[in-house]
Amino acid sequence: MKTFSAKPKEVRRDWYLVDANGVTLGRLASEIARRLRGKHKAIYTPHIDTGDYIVVVNAEKIRATGKKMAQKHYYRHSGYPGGIKSLTLEKLLERAPERAIELAVKGMLPKNPLGRAMFRKLNVYGGSNHPHIAQQPQPLKI
């Protein structure tokens, strides 16, 4: 018996709608990353993008355990000496609630062109409205 390898044109992609209201950030991100990679499918092939599309709503209502809202920092650097900036999770959720989920999921995907292709299938929205109604996303409970 030969080992099965999925072909890119044969992969069927579904759309899922995830409500992030009251869900812990890390648990949400790990399940989303698993679905984006396609590891939940029997046809999973490591070098082929077999994942599904994910739409996340209510990103502003995620939870963090412990004191992470005040103590978890996100860093960026301008490239100039002394140009390091930091932002707490609390401030990040005020400014751009989608970004917290995007950063958590991006860190759990491969750091290569295939991982970037997987990340493009993620759509995160701060509120409860989204423009993907035509795709008829199925609700996914996490």
Swiss-Prot record:
Part of the 50S ribosomal subunit. SUPFAM superfamilies: Ribosomal protein L13. Keywords: Ribonucleoprotein, Ribosomal protein. Gene3D superfamilies: Ribosomal protein L13 (3.90.1180.10). It comes from the Bacteria. The keyword Protein transport does not apply. PROSITE patterns: RIBOSOMAL_L13. The gene is rplM. The keyword Glycoprotein does not apply. One of its GO terms (biological process) is negative regulation of translation. Belongs to the universal ribosomal protein uL13 family. This is Large ribosomal subunit protein uL13. This protein is one of the early assembly proteins of the 50S ribosomal subunit, although it is not seen to bind rRNA by itself. It is important during the early stages of 50S assembly. One of its GO terms (molecular function) is mRNA binding. Pfam families: Ribosomal_L13 (PF00572). GO terms for cellular component: cytosolic large ribosomal subunit. The lineage of its organism: Bacteria, Pseudomonadati, Pseudomonadota, Gammaproteobacteria, Chromatiales.
